[in-house]
Amino acid sequence: MAYLVWGKGRSGLAAFNLLKAKGFKAYIGDDKEDKNLWQDVWNEIDTVVLSPGIPPFHPLWKEAIKSSKEVIGETELAYRFYKGKNIIAVTGTDGKSTTVHLIHHFTSFKEGGNFGTPFSEIVLDNDKENVALEASSFQGKTLDTFRPNVGVFLNFSKDHLDWHPSLEDYLLSKQKIFKNQTQEDILILNAQKPVCDTPSLAKKIFFGENGDLKVVGSDVYYKDELLIENISHPSLKGLHNLYNIAVASFVAFSMGISLEEIKKNLETFEALPFRYQYLGNFEGIDICNDSKSTTVNALMSALESTKAPILLIAGGIDKGGDFSSIEAYKDKIKAVFLYGKDKNLIKDQIEHFLKVYVLEDLESALLKVKEQARKGDTILFSPACASFDMFESYKHRGEVFNELVKKHFNS
């Protein structure tokens, strides 16, 4: 049995190292340095292990299907060597990392997957480790035997259509994460369609306003009985984050962690940066950095959670979202400041109901916002777009925004 790992990022290297440690013949390459390698070793290999960034239309993927070679991802590979009993898998368009980080904090399970440590790296270190994995649609598409005993599907909205051939494929790739669950397993689902229709034999628990698990004020109820009182957290503002806490708490409770311990652990939780991160009050103006917002759905959650009047900074590379949907929040938004590659495309969708300024870059946008801001306003940086037109990643974008705030505002 021989493998070809394609992609030399952290997950690709982790997969390659795991295979070598297990004594398998394996090659590793990528499009930048080893473009022809896969053709040179094609007749020797049985299985192709693709990194999450390799899309279905990549020539290697197409050739593998044509040649009837097995195509899997790093998560599936790691699972085949995993000997532990507890895998929690969390997916959704938004909120995955925060929820996994909460579960890790409540349970001490090793966190990883799409964010942080690759599953293969965890398995190589300890193949019996209890794990909480963030699972993306890219990883879901290349799963086969993977089976989490606890699954979570937080939400679903249009995203990644530059990678998936259709919205249906994006949804099916996420649902595939749970296809091997049995009646012994648990699947926690958003009560809204299409998430609630996810096929699985697992015991299903729905969350949301009309679900089994719901947030009322800041309290969590399960089947109309109080489960946990006051789950509010200063770094996790908004209803969407209360549900992230509620779901993570329920997962931890289902794994045997007491409600008292969950509450105690919540008090010491430190939120991940750039996810609706409150930077502070500057000369009477609140500033929030939500650079992780790469979809309109994430922007909507941020707008829902932010006190008016809002000065919104957004823009970057549009991912096919419907920006006209923010009309529902037009009474909260004082003005919108757009920058980035698709600023004019976004402007065309919202200028008939909002005051819009179009700027050259993020710093220009922030300076224009500073001109317009008054005491009591909230500056919300929630781009709702990919970052790669001007930044290396959403993290880099978030770091730049924080530096610009330090440069132009006095605390």
Curated annotation (Swiss-Prot):
Q: What class of enzyme is it?
A: ligase
Q: Which Gene3D superfamilies match?
A: Mur ligase, C-terminal domain, Mur-like, catalytic domain
GO molecular function terms attached to this record: ATP binding; UDP-N-acetylmuramoylalanine-D-glutamate ligase activity
Q: Which UniProt keywords apply?
A: ATP-binding, Cell cycle, Cell division, Cell shape, Cell wall biogenesis/degradation, Cytoplasm, Ligase, Nucleotide-binding, Peptidoglycan synthesis
Query: Which cysteines in this chain are paired by disulphide bridges?
Result: none
Tell me which InterPro entries the record gives: Mur-like_cat_sf, Mur_ligase_C, Mur_ligase_C_dom_sf, Mur_ligase_cen, MurD
Cell membrane in keyword set: no
Q: Where in the cell is it found?
A: Cytoplasm
What is catalysed by this protein?
UDP-N-acetyl-alpha-D-muramoyl-L-alanine + D-glutamate + ATP = UDP-N-acetyl-alpha-D-muramoyl-L-alanyl-D-glutamate + ADP + phosphate + H(+)
Give the EC number(s) under which this enzyme is classified: 6.3.2.9
- Give the UniProt entry's GO cellular component terms: cytoplasm
An example Gene Ontology biological process: cell division
Q: Binding of ATP: at which residues? A: G92, T93, D94, G95, K96, S97, T98
Q: What pathway, per the record?
A: Cell wall biogenesis; peptidoglycan biosynthesis
Q: Which family does it belong to?
A: Belongs to the MurCDEF family.
Function (record text): Cell wall formation. Catalyzes the addition of glutamate to the nucleotide precursor UDP-N-acetylmuramoyl-L-alanine (UMA).
Protein's UniProt name: UDP-N-acetylmuramoylalanine--D-glutamate ligase
